[in-house]
């Protein structure tokens, strides 16, 4: 630990590239972003699309990105399903990158345990050794969160242990994390109206909301007419200096490629001119 004067602090340089990984403060190096939503809201496909965008340094739904080495760690779906989805998306979008790494471990990996931390550390070290460009930032995608905990997802001790271990990895290996997670069950008030608490709809302890730098929410908007369109919103952007409006995305089932079909217009603000890509 070092104690800096004002001059020393202003002269300090981080041990990693300081470029924003996703612009507008959405994802900065050494931070944690969560993408959450209910079952069937295309979260995993969103994470695959995001992984390809970062690995290629191409825009993610119109937001510029910095090229990164991306390690997608999927513990819910069988390897064959991930292979089929990734292949279909890659063919449909004509996208490929040597900066992408995937793992679907056969055994459970719990990051609220010492053994789980050690195992993921080994995996990250292997990815860094095999990276085509060691200068690129490393982004680790964990999907889904609840399977990375041996304890209960609402238990304060277990949640803090998970967060401490992830923080240790961030600091020691200069890692940026993206975590895929579920929303809690929908609640209604006495009049039958749905109660929506924004980022507080994350399943589990409020310690998640407090810890995360960015929270991206995906909500299915056409469950009875195609089940293929979601609304994406930024429920928390700790490091953004501007308000980020949401947008609607249609997922094309024939190739698993997404398309922005509408952007939210904020009253009293100028409409966004960001490309619909």
Which residues fall in each region the model found?
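Structured loop/turn residues at beta-strand edges in well-structured enzyme cores
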Residues: 30, 68, 134-136, 173, ...
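Conserved NTP-handling cores and scaffolds of large molecular machines
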Residues: 54, 58, 86, 90-93, ...
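A conditional alpha-helix N-cap/helix-loop micro-motif detector
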Residues: 15-16, 28, 113, 117, ...
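Conserved inter-motif catalytic segment of the P-loop NTP-binding fold
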Residues: 65-161, 168, 251-254, 264-267, ...
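Phosphate-binding/switch region of NTP-binding enzymes
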Residues: 34-35, 40, 45, 71-73, ...
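A generic local structural motif
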Residues: 19-22, 57-60, 122, 126, ...
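The Walker A/P-loop phosphate-binding site
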Residues: 1-94
């Amino acid at each position: 630990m070092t104690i800096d004067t004002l001059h020393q602090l202003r002269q300090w340089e981080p041990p990693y590239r300081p470029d924003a990984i996703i612009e507008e403060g959405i994802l900065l190096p050494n931070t944690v972003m969560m993408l959450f939503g209910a079952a069937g809201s295309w979260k995993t496909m969103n994470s695959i699309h995001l992984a390809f965008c970062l690995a290629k340094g191409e825009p993610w739904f119109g937001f510029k990105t910095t090229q990164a080495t991306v390690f997608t760690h999927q513990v819910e779906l069988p390897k064959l399903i991930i292979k089929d989805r990734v292949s279909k998306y890659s063919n449909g979008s004509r996208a490929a990158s040597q900066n992408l790494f995937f793992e679907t471990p056969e055994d459970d990996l719990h990051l609220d345990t010492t053994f789980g931390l050690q195992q993921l550390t080994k995996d990250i070290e292997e990815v860094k050794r095999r990276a085509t460009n060691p200068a690129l930032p490393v982004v680790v995608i964990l999907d889904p969160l609840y399977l990375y905990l041996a304890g209960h997802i609402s238990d304060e001790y277990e949640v803090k242990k998970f967060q401490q271990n992830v923080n240790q990895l961030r600091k020691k290996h200069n890692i940026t994390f993206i975590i895929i997670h579920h929303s809690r069950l929908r609640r209604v008030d006495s009049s039958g109206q749905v109660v929506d608490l924004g980022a507080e709809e994350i399943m589990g302890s409020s310690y998640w909301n407090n810890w995360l730098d960015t929270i991206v929410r995906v909500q299915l908007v056409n469950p009875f007419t195609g089940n293929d369109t979601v609304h994406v919103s930024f429920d928390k952007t700790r490091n953004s200096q501007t308000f980020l409006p949401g947008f609607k995305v249609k997922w094309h089932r024939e190739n698993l490629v997404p398309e922005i079909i509408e952007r939210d217009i904020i009253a009293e603000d100028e409409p966004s001119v960001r490309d619909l890509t």
